[in-house]
Amino acid sequence: MIPAEFPAILELNSNYACRSKCRRAFFFGAKQMTDAEILTLVDRLERCLLAKEEFHHRDHLSVAVVYLYACDLETAMDRMRSSLKRFASHHGVAGLYHETLTRFWLLQVEQRLDRRQCLEDSVRKAQEQLSDKNLAFEYYSRERIESKEARETWLEPDLKNA
């Protein structure tokens, strides 16, 4: 089931021709997701219908794109935080959520987001450009990013600006 507010995203995107030529293109060993599949992923995350093992880095990026299409940065951050905390709690790993990393990745997605593109192209672009999970270590020292404070609150990068 696709959340009620998300059809507006599809409507917004219908104004722009999707530049993806091959919906079956393989990326990270999985086919490129369609708009409906992306929105279903968000719905399944929000309703905790995904197994913990089903939600990977590329899925975090997909959700970030959807939230940033639907809302401003702070509202998207609130939704991302809420969804991830609920998901982690549901799977018995409530302490897994990391505020600094969540905001870092959301900012990285926002910087690359072109809302004139269709949703699936934006997701594909985010997944291609932000596939390296270690990117955060170009901005943060290991000590800083692994601190309790970074897990609980937003910390500015200590190596270079995000």
Regions found by a protein language model. Give the residues of each.
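Intrinsically disordered, low-complexity serine/threonine- and proline-rich regulatory segments
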Residues: 33-50
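Conserved, aromatic- and glycine-enriched, well-ordered alpha/beta core segments
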Residues: 48-118
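A charged, amphipathic interaction segment
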Residues: 98-162
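Intrinsic-disorder-associated interaction segments
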Residues: 31-34, 116
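Leucine-biased recognition of intrinsically disordered, low-complexity hydrophobic segments
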Residues: 10-12
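Aromatic (phenylalanine/tyrosine) cluster motif
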Residues: 6, 16, 26-28
